[in-house]
Amino acid sequence: MNTPQDSSLGREVSYPSQYDPGLLFPIPRSGARAEIGLDDAALPFVGHDRWHAFELSWLDPRGKPQVAVATVQVPCTSPRLIESKSFKLYLNSLNSTRIDSAEALRARIVADLSDCAGAPVQVEFGLPGLRETPLGESIDGLELEIDCYGPPQADFLSANAGEVVEETLVSALLKSNCPVTGQPDWATVSLRYRGPKIDRAGLLRYLVSYREHAEFHEQCVERIFSEVSARCQPQWLEVEARYTRRGGLDINPWRASPGIAAPAATYRELRQ
């Protein structure tokens, strides 16, 4: 079984000079899910991992360089996630490769990523536009003392069963760390839900308690979804984290209660 420590993360690697789908490094989702009591065969959520790729280039049949940007969507039901540095190296391996057309390139990327993830992956050229302010109500202006930065503390979460609301809460203060390199991962996270009103101060303390936590982006979002669901008992819940760019890629994991329609990729955060 592949582990993060087996990947190219934290290692000096030479950039590929020719196309090589073998650079893609899959990591099973099951291990991290088991740690928080999730079973791949009975997931409590639907969702996807949406990537924005900013550094995509190849050669046309005459050798002229071409450039593009792309949006990639990996279903959360795939047995494997795609490690980000390997994804970057894979895209770099296309830089000196002659390809008949943009559509031929897209089809090749779809096939390679689907094989890596173990499920059909969607790839489209183009990116959503920027939005200066996130959709929802920010909780970052709350005045409170915080002294816990990890590990994540679900005990901070609570909700008022006597007041049922439907709202979207947003924080730009989510930070976690790569489990291999220790590099910081920054994100704006939004929680849209209907149910007992979530205590905002407790939610902010909970999100800040990820600050020294080491876990991949996708795993953090699944942990947030699971712990908010368990502690606050919403009727339904959506959690999305929009991470800042690294190596020409940003990732946006989204998890939601079954039956919730996937959001359209209509915008990117200003920090992306």
Curated annotation (Swiss-Prot):
Localisation: Cytoplasm
Domain of life: Bacteria
GO cellular component: cytoplasm
Pathway: tRNA modification; tRNA-queuosine biosynthesis
InterPro entries for this protein: GTP-CH-I_C/QueF (IPR043133), NADPH_dep_7-cyano-7-deazaG_red (IPR050084), QueF (IPR029500), QueF_N (IPR029139), QueF_type2 (IPR016428)
Binding annotation for NADPH: 84-85, 246-247
Catalytically driven reaction(s): 7-aminomethyl-7-carbaguanine + 2 NADP(+) = 7-cyano-7-deazaguanine + 2 NADPH + 3 H(+)
Active site (UniProt): 178, 185
Class in the EC hierarchy, top level: oxidoreductase
Positions that bind substrate: 82-84, 217-218
Keyword terms: Cytoplasm, NADP, Oxidoreductase, Queuosine biosynthesis
Entry EC no(s): 1.7.1.13
Gene3D superfamilies attached to this UniProt entry: 3.30.1130.10
Protein's GO biological process: queuosine biosynthetic process; tRNA modification
GO molecular-function terms, A-Z: preQ1 synthase activity
Similarity section: Belongs to the GTP cyclohydrolase I family. QueF type 2 subfamily.
HAMAP family in the cross-refs: QueF_type2
Subunit structure: Homodimer.
Purpose of the protein: Catalyzes the NADPH-dependent reduction of 7-cyano-7-deazaguanine (preQ0) to 7-aminomethyl-7-deazaguanine (preQ1).
Protein name: NADPH-dependent 7-cyano-7-deazaguanine reductase
Provenance organism: Stenotrophomonas maltophilia (strain K279a)
Lineage, highest ranks first: Bacteria, Pseudomonadati, Pseudomonadota, Gammaproteobacteria, Lysobacterales
